[in-house]
Amino acid sequence: PKSRFVANFIGKSTIFEGRVEAVSGTRSIITSEQAGTNFVLRRNIEAIEDQEIWVGLRPEKIVISKDKPEDYNPNKPVNCIKGIVEDIAYMGGLSTYHVRTANGNIIKSTDFNIERNADHPSWDDEVYLTWESENIMVLYS
């Protein structure tokens, strides 16, 4: 999808307002004060520097973990948001985590319930939400 309307119409996505910081042949950076992170894409986007833009993330593309990523920098996070698990919805083989970020946003992450004894996050746990560059949707309107 290229618009916020379509992204939300075809499924639930978390959408953040951002601004294009840099665009080069193989890398683009979008900063988002609303999200509290930088979105780094390993591709060129159809935008110019300083352009207002939106980014979207699908819940099933967001990885949730209690472990801090090795390259996590709290002063300049990249493709990662820290938060607290506020709610968990169990739906058969899936769990949807509702994570509140420091900016007050609620981000949903969906995870499979494959292992019963796995160390899944629980209510009030501090967690890190990460995603791969190719899973960032760039929305132009």
What are these language model-derived features?
Residues 13-15, 22-141:
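Non-catalytic connector elements of ABC transporters
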Residues 1-11:
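Conserved beta-strand-loop-alpha-helix hinge in the C-terminal portion
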